[in-house]
Amino acid sequence: VQALAQLPELAAPVLALNHIDSPELAGTALFQFGLAPEDEAREVARRAWLEGYTRAAILVPESDWSDRVTAAFTDQWLQLGGYILEQQRYNPAEADHGPAITALLNLDSSQLRKTRLVRQLGRTLEFEPRRRQDIDFIFLLATPEQARLIRPQLKFYRASSVPVLSTSHVYSGQIDSERDSDLDGLQFCDMPWLLDENGNWQHLRNALTARRPAQSVRYARLQALGIDAWRITPYLDQLGGSMFGNYHGSTGNLQVDAAQQVHRTLQWAHF
């Protein structure tokens, strides 16, 4: 995509299946369409705001990818008027996320106060750590495997009543009631291809599943991207114009910005 953007001219409109970091460098004939996780992060921020939340805590893995997605969420959340009370990163290679969670909930501060009191009073105290009570929701970035570890640990550390909102990365793409039982109540956004059983693409999904069942889940989101790309390509000249507006696709409700990047509005579900 970067190479296409650097060309002085394109002979015909081109729909590239990815985004570049500097869309202003692209020519007027280059359109960019990808499954950008940043779009999902902004979607989470908008959803939380519509729910009436104003105070967020962020729990994300240690990675460059996570930093980019978190930045997109943070920018959107602050623009809406929200506050970020705490942000912690966890090691995705570990199973015990207690240190990150206790810091997120200020339980480490509660323990520190207890230690100081014991030192000052010189005697043992009965003590039950108290988490902070001002968090409206937690923005969680995690894979299904990580979320299945983190959600029970949040409950263990007395945060079972705090809503958790996440991106599509928390969902494997297929219902697994047994393995996902600990995720009950967790909200996430994802594409209609996986959530809407009444879409006009359902016959295509059924055909792909019947033909290649092993790949129908693993590559489901890429299949949806290909279908939407095929369907909107004839209308590239109209994309973003007042006559076209948006397109209700299998990857989401599609709109084009001034830099000719296609953005998605997703659907919501919960475990």
Task: Report the location of each language-model feature.
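Solvent-exposed loop/turn segments at secondary-structure junctions
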Residues: V1, H19-E24, E62-D67, Y90-A95, ...
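Periplasmic-binding protein-like
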Residues: V1, V14-L17, R55-P61, S110-P144, ...
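Extracytoplasmic ligand/sensor domains, especially the bilobed periplasmic-binding protein
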Residues: V1-R89
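Stable alpha-helical elements in mature extracytoplasmic
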Residues: A3-L4, E40-V44, W65, V69-Q76, ...
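Short hydrophobic alpha-helices and adjacent helix-cap/hinge residues
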Residues: A16-D21, P99-A103, A229
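Extracellular/periplasmic periplasmic-binding protein-like sensory domains
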Residues: G27-L30, A100-V118, Q133-I135, R151-I227
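Sec/Tat-exported extracytoplasmic proteins
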Residues: A48-G52, V60, F73-G81, L105-D108, ...
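Segments of small-molecule ligand-sensing domains
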Residues: H203-F271
